[in-house]
Amino acid sequence: MRILVTNDDGIDALGIKRLVEALLTLEGAEVSIVAPVEEKSGVGHGITYRSALSPEQRDFYGMPVKAWAVNGNPADCVKAAYHLLFEHGKKPDIVFSGINVGTNLGRDIYYSGTCSGAREAVILGVPGVALSYDNWFDQDNYGDVVEMIRPLVKEFSDRAIKGELASEVFWNINIPHVPLAEVKGMVPATLSMNHYEDKYSEEAEGYYLAREYPQVMPLAEPLDYDLLKHGYIAITPVHIDATDRTLLKQMDNWALLKAWGKQEE
């Protein structure tokens, strides 16, 4: 099984090391790492095409893996790995992106470099999984995360090999920062559309964006934000086709479109 790993915190981040540790417990796993040379948090799905990418092969903590650092974004890393670094006919069977420092919940998926790594995999026809850990305020502490994700990476890897993961969908997984014994379960989750409150603080060199998190609500609905804060691992399938087909149908009644009519072939 060929597994590609990327992230947005950079190749030297502790989270990607923990992810690789979990992946190396899988039988027959051939792990390759292609990750940014420096942190690329919040870059969304940006790609590099006006400057050259220069993948640099390097050692990765002495682990039995191949690793490259790339002067680009997470989506660049996956794209470059797919087209340049994997041998012809030996493309990855699955891509894991993470483990991110801090969560990627709700609308975060549009800003997240971690999610873009998984999304780019799906664009290229490979299953993609994004993993994030709720340790933003305790960034050097990954606790029991390896034990938490080991069954997850096995499940998704097994399903990828069997062709059981839906195409056009990447998987967004958020993990609570609690001991393993306190995890209440793994549950399917809907993206929360709660709004963050954006605030800018003025410093000597300019303005910094700070985000205040919404209030945690009772579990009336299976929303990723609330589930995570209540101690659950939240798993969300995210479709990359963002077309609103209900509105698309309604547009047939727009006067403007009727006036112009459909173009003849």
Swiss-Prot record:
Reaction(s) catalysed by this chain's protein: a ribonucleoside 5'-phosphate + H2O = a ribonucleoside + phosphate
Cofactor note: Binds 1 divalent metal cation per subunit.
Cofactor(s), names only, from the UniProt record: a divalent metal cation
EC number: 3.1.3.5
Molecular functions per Gene Ontology: 5'-nucleotidase activity; metal ion binding; nucleotide binding
Broad class of where this protein is predominantly found: cytoplasm
One GO CC annotation: cytoplasm
Key words, A-Z: Cytoplasm, Hydrolase, Metal-binding, Nucleotide-binding
Sequence positions that bind a divalent metal cation: 8-9, 41, 100
InterPro entries, alphabetized: SurE, SurE-like_Pase/nucleotidase, SurE-like_sf
Coiled-coil region: none
SUPFAM superfamilies in alphabetical order: SurE-like
Coiled coil in keyword set: no
Purpose: Nucleotidase that shows phosphatase activity on nucleoside 5'-monophosphates.
Family note: Belongs to the SurE nucleotidase family.
Protein name: 5'-nucleotidase SurE
